[in-house]
Design a protein with these regions (language model features):
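Conserved SAM/SAH cofactor-binding pocket of Class I
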Residues: 1-56
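Short glycine- and Lys/Arg-enriched binding-loop motifs that mark or flank ligand-binding interfaces
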Residues: 2, 25, 62-66, 85
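Conserved SAM-binding loop
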Residues: 6, 66, 93
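A generic short-segment signal for beta-strand/edge and adjacent turn/coil regions
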Residues: 10, 29, 59-62, 98-105
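Glycine-centered flexibility motif
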Residues: 36, 66-70, 100
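Mobile active-site "lid"/loop adjacent to the S-adenosyl-L-methionine
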Residues: 45-73
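Conserved Class I SAM-dependent methyltransferase catalytic core
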Residues: 71-133
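Flexible, glycine-/basic-rich loop-and-beta segments that form/coincide
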Residues: 137-139
Length: 139
């Protein structure tokens, strides 16, 4: 049977998603508390470059803090997500131009995955948001 599961490290987000949408939710740091394979994995990663001195110990800030490069969480996510992806599955990953589009695509390639922009939108001050469609490399 198809299974939909929402995962977040923020306990407030997990409780809210379950209450509002009624979907199965799990509090987890990425896939640490998740098992199984999935046909589709969606990830709105913390993608904003954040210097150590800019860090605030707050759940909302945690949702945005992508580390110095903006890719710290994405670097941990990709190998884990690929190990939870079915052979024909795909990942949709939201990133920002501040995160580095080419650098993120290169990370995917280093993990044995192909990545292509499937949607983009300018948000403000020239910042672009991209949705990357990521699949296992066939080569």
């Amino acid at each position: 049977a198809p299974r939909t599961i929402g995962v977040d490290i923020n306990p407030h987000a997990v409780a809210y998603a379950h209450a509002v949408n009624g979907v199965e939710t799990v509090r987890s740091d990425l896939f640490s508390a998740v098992s199984g394979k999935f046909d589709l994995i969606l990830f709105n990663a913390p993608y904003l470059p954040t210097l150590p001195e800019e860090r605030i110990d707050d759940w909302l800030e945690c949702a945005l803090d992508g580390g110095v490069s903006g890719r710290d969480v994405i670097e941990r996510f990709l190998p884990q997500a690929l190990s939870h992806l079915t052979d024909t599955g795909r990942i949709l990953l939201l990133i920002s131009s501040l995160t580095g589009l080419l650098e993120t695509v290169s990370l995917c390639a280093a993990c044995g995955a192909d990545a292509a922009v499937c949607a983009e939108e300018e948000v403000e001050d020239g910042e672009m948001l991209y949705v990357l469609k990521i699949t296992r490399s066939l080569a």
